[in-house]
Curated annotation (Swiss-Prot):
Region (Disordered): 559-586, 655-701
Subunit structure: The complex is composed of six subunits: RnfA, RnfB, RnfC, RnfD, RnfE and RnfG.
Database matches in NCBIfam families: PRK05035.1, rnfC
Function: Part of a membrane-bound complex that couples electron transfer with translocation of ions across the membrane.
Topology with respect to the bilayer: Peripheral membrane protein
Pfam families attached to this UniProt entry: Complex1_51K (PF01512), Fer4_7 (PF12838), RnfC_N (PF13375)
Cellular component, GO annotation: plasma membrane
Name of this chain's protein: Ion-translocating oxidoreductase complex subunit C
PROSITE patterns: 4FE4S_FER_1, 4FE4S_FER_2
Cofactor annotation comment: Binds 2 [4Fe-4S] clusters per subunit.
Polar residues bias (residue ranges): 559-583, 661-687
Length: 723
């Protein structure tokens, strides 16, 4: 920074590479003082008129607004508000044609003027020294002031970021465009207010040096500023050679200090800050007069305009309205430019409004304007590179822009292009290089903006997730605390924790349902010899329990069989005593004995456990096997066979009864008939002669088997018929 001041204090003027001296046409419009443009009936104020984001709307359709009333509200120093240019009613808030070569629309507030031009309440101050630097920066921000030299960067943000870094404050009055004279006339007509605005900036920034730089083709403006200073030495004036584009910020710094601003950095990095003379004037009006930025000086020039000059124009005024008031006659063959011939934009629609960016309306005639020649191929002549004041390679950037190679465009420093138009001016192939560069910049900006928004959305989502997690944890913690407090309260009242008691009951219930005898982990014992052997005591205990259950089942079955046997023996004795009545009595007694056996067996089966039932089944099975094998036994066992025959008959009758219950009534009758036959067979068996008694048990068993088979067959037939 010391080098900057040392170089500036040397009084030397440096030069920059490139640049041209185009024909000068300033005399068309700088011969008369600035006048006020008449007010139109309808204003269209774009909500975004600066380099940054649009503010939030404060008005709605149907609202009545006063002159200077804010229409939007910013959120941060780079989101500038816009203000009502006059009093009137908000007709609509809708897209309106923009002052851009694309012809696209942008959101604007449509105000219908009431003709009163009534100001909102104002609070002017006489002495800005009574305010702090922060208060002054806030006033500049609330006034919506942006750089009026062409960049329209928010002034408050620029000043705030450069505080305590600035050693040299440069006020740019070079105005190098060949047709534009708005700054020239402003310095001639309002030098005192410009000086007052510069002193406000000096008070905020506290630089060591302040200088006003003016090109040598504006002698009247230089003299006017000197007269306003009245010999004060706090502000210097430096007259620089006329050369395009000496009014560009980096080129003017190089002329005054011989230093270049590093690529990708701001001038404050070397201790320099630059403001336009129009911006200094707007700062004075905002601080001293409490007037927001609602108008600016606009140069109306070109041979198609009879009444050339500079006018104070309110923002939102349609360009067509301005041109009509200065005698312009529309000609579709000749374009109208917003800005100068070097950096200006072609307007496809003259209904676009004047904004903070609009410093000149140029309407040339056919003597001044040559139609765009047909674009030809690049011949690699390097004329564009030689003329470029920032040492770029426009021919390479041209190829990358055409092929949309965004990475290469950035690699070759497209962002450092100041869009001065020199490359297109000197190109022998008539290639509109600036158009290609602007389009490429817009595409790169759009890609980065989408990536930025995606990253911001990701950060917002992650922040939301963290917030939701914190809220969920806090909710769970509150619930736990409330539950603990409730349990403590109940425990204090009853002496027992209800939750723990409920859990204990649930565990006991589940254990009772699912409890089964389990063998614990393998245990070992040491015998007398010192050998380690497995401890099978639990397994042996389980086996013993199962064995006792089987024995109990067998004993129960034996008791049933004993009762049946005793009944059979008594029947046989009665038959032997009364042979005449044996046929009638044996059948009845056998039926009674069988019924008693069935009842006792059923009762015992209901009272015993499942294990006992299984053992009973096994015993019955063994008994049946004994029945089948009975005929093959020796003659010595034949005397006890009648008992088994009676058991077999009882089993046959039980099976017949079960089959009868599952089948139809007719099947039941047939089964009953079979049972009667079986009974008759059993009854008639003892009445045979004494010689046949030894063989009767076998025949009885065979007859019982045949009866069972017939009963089963009849039951199956009846079931099939029923189906």
């Amino acid at each position: 920074m010391t080098d900057v001041l040392a170089r500036f204090n040397s009084g030397k003027l440096w030069d920059f590479d490139g640049g041209i001296h185009p024909p000068e046409m300033k005399s068309q419009s700088n011969q008369t003082p600035i006048t006020k443009a008449p007010l139109t009936e309808d204003f269209y104020i774009p909500v975004k008129q600066h380099a940054g984001d649009a503010g939030n709307l404060l008005v709605k359709e149907g609202d009545y607004v006063l002159k200077g009333q804010p229409l939007t509200q910013g959120d941060g120093l780079r989101m500038l508000p816009v203000h009502a240019p006059t009093s009137g009613t908000v007709i609509a808030i809708a897209p309106h044609i923009a002052a851009h070569p694309s012809g696209l629309s942008e959101l604007a507030v449509h105000i219908h003027a009431d003709g009163k031009d009534q100001w909102r309440e104002q609070n002017p101050i006489d002495d800005f020294l009574s305010q702090s630097a922060e208060q002054l920066i806030e006033k500049i921000y609330q006034a919506g002031i942006a750089g009026l030299g062409g960049a329209v960067f928010p002034t408050a943000a620029k000043i705030d970021s450069a505080q305590k870094k600035v050693k040299l404050l440069i006020i740019n009055g070079a105005e190098c465009e060949p047709y534009i004279t708005c700054d020239d006339r402003l310095m001639r007509d309002n030098p005192d207010e410009i000086i007052e605005g510069i002193r406000i900036l000096r008070y905020i920034l506290r630089p060591e040096k302040v200088v006003i730089a003016v090109e040598d083709n504006k002698p009247e403006a230089v003299q006017s500023i000197k007269n306003a200073l009245q010999g004060a030495n706090d502000i210097e004036i430096r007259v620089i050679p006329t050369k395009y584009p000496s009014g560009a910020a980096k080129q003017l710094i190089q002329i005054l200090t011989g230093m270049e601003v590093p690529a990708g950095q701001r001038s404050s990095s070397i201790g320099v800050l630059m403001q336009n003379v129009g911006t200094a004037f707007a700062i004075k009006r905002a601080i001293i007069n409490d007037e927001p930025l609602i108008e600016r000086v606009v140069t109306l020039t070109g041979d198609k305009i009879p009444n050339k000059g500079n006018q104070w124009v309110r923002f939102g005024t349609p360009i067509s309205f301005l041109l009509k008031n200065v005698g312009y006659q529309y000609d579709e063959r000749l374009p109208v430019f917003l800005g100068g011939p070097m950096m200006g934009l072609t307007l496809p629609n003259l209904d676009a409004p004047i904004t903070k960016l609009g410093n000149c309306i140029l309407a040339p005639d056919h003597f001044e304007y040559d139609p765009q020649a047909r674009e030809q191929s690049c011949i690699r002549c390097s004329a564009c590179s030689d003329a470029c004041p920032v040492h770029l390679m426009p021919q390479q950037l041209y190829w990358y822009a055409r092929s949309e190679d965004h990475e290469k465009s950035e690699e070759y420093s497209l962002k450092d292009c100041i869009e001065c138009g020199l490359c297109a001016y000197v190109c022998p192939s008539h290639i509109p290089l600036i158009q290609y560069f602007r389009q490429e910049k817009a595409k790169i900006w759009e890609i980065k903006d989408k990536a930025k928004k995606a990253e911001e959305a990701k950060l917002r989502f992650e922040a939301k997730q963290r917030r939701l997690e914190r809220e969920e944890q806090a909710r769970k913690l509150r619930s736990q605390r409330a539950a603990e407090a409730r349990r403590e309260e109940l425990a204090n009242q009853k002496g027992v924790d209800p939750v723990k008691a409920a859990l204990e009951r649930l565990k006991q219930k589940q254990a009772a349902i699912t409890e089964k005898p389990k063998i614990s982990a393998l245990k070992t014992v040491v015998n007398e010899k010192g050998e380690v052997l497995p401890d099978n005591s639990e397994v042996m205990a389980l086996r013993k329990a199962r064995r006792l259950a089987r024995q109990q089942a067998i004993s129960t079955e034996n008791s049933v069989l004993t009762q049946v046997d005793s009944g059979t023996q008594s029947d046989n004795s009665d038959v032997q005593k009364n042979p005449e009545n044996s046929t009638a009595l044996d059948g009845k007694k056998a039926a009674i004995a069988a019924a008693l056996a069935r009842a006792k067996a059923k009762k015992l089966a209901q009272n015993n456990t499942e294990s006992v039932s299984d053992n009973v089944t096994a015993v019955k099975s063994a008994v049946q096997n004994t029945e089948i094998s009975a005929p093959s036994d020796s003659a010595e066992k034949t005397e006890t066979d009648p008992k088994k025959v009676a058991i077999a008959a009882a089993i046959a009758r039980a099976k017949a009864k079960k089959a009868a219950q599952n089948n139809t009534e007719s099947a039941s009758d047939n089964v009953s008939a079979v049972k009667s036959a079986v009974q008759n067979t059993e009854i008639s068996a003892p009445s045979d002669s004494a010689e046949k008694t030894k063989t009767d048990p076998k025949k009885a068993a065979i007859a019982a088997a045949i009866a069972r088979a017939k009963a089963k067959k009849l039951a199956q037939q009846q079931s099939n018929k029923t189906e």
